[in-house]
């Protein structure tokens, strides 16, 4: 799988859901999010892991690694995950040890009011050299405009210029993409007939970027 690309169509949702089940991972209850998980979970390497925005984390329970696992969110899930330390706090100011983590994941979070500059700076502070950051997000191009909220937070579906800005900020902070971005998009997979928030009137897809710390 490419690690810097976009969800193209429903067939990819079906294929990645099957992939997770066949490889011993439990799939997400929102099936299109299995596209994110199927890219990230097999690629995670041994070492400390932090899921940034872990309220409904399918990463932490699925990650088959030896090493400490942490999650941070302003709102914690109402359950515990065996072997995982869950922290209530700001993912842009985690107060966790510097250069400690091998892997950071941030799944469908940065479109909800996250400051890209503060986020990138904190990720660089947390990652070991050679450690990876996986970021997924809601996406459509051209830009979907208008004021939207979801989960009580601002909801900014990213467009190409937004993503290019995020990449530039991350690179300036000290992380590089693991490969060139495949900017092609096909279908607005997430729509009112398939998992878009009820009444939102928007249609979009998912994107994934993978960075490595210098």
Model feature map: region roles:
Residues 1-43:
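Class I SAM-dependent methyltransferase Rossmann-like catalytic core
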Residues 37, 56-61, 78-80, 95, ...:
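Short catalytic/ligand-binding loop motif for oxyanion handling, primarily in non-cytosolic enzymes
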Residues 41-46, 94-95:
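Glycine-rich helix-loop-beta junction characteristic of Rossmann-like nucleotide cofactor-binding loops
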Residues 49, 104, 109:
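Receiver (REC) domain switch-region micro-motif
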Residues 50-93:
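Class I SAM-dependent methyltransferase SAM/SAH-binding core
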Residues 92-104:
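A short acidic, Gly/Pro-enriched loop at the edge of an enzyme's catalytic core
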Residues 105, 114-124, 128-214:
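S-adenosyl-L-methionine-dependent methyltransferase catalytic module, highlighting the catalytic core
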């Amino acid at each position: 799988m490419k690690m810097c690309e976009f969800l193209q169509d429903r067939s990819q949702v079906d294929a990645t859901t099957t992939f997770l089940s066949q490889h011993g991972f439990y799939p997400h209850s929102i099936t299109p999010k299995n596209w994110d998980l199927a890219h990230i979970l097999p690629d995670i390497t041994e070492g400390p892991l932090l899921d940034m925005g872990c309220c409904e984390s399918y990463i932490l329970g699925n990650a088959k690694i030896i090493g400490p696992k942490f999650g941070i969110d302003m709102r914690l899930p109402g359950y515990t995950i065996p072997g995982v330390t869950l922290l209530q706090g700001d993912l842009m100011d985690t107060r966790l040890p510097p250069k400690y983590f091998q892997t950071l994941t941030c799944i469908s979070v940065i479109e909800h009011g996250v400051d890209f500059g503060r986020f990138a700076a904190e990720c660089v502070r947390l990652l070991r050299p050679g450690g990876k950051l996986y970021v997924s997000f809601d996406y459509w191009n051209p830009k979907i405009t208008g004021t939207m909220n979801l989960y009580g937070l601002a909801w900014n579906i990213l467009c190409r210029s937004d993503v290019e800005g995020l990449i530039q900020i991350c690179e300036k902070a000290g992380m590089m993409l693991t490969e060139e971005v495949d900017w092609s998009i096909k279908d607005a997979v997430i729509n009112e007939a398939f998992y878009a928030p009820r009444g939102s009137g928007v249609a979009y897809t998912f994107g994934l970027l993978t960075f490595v710390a210098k």
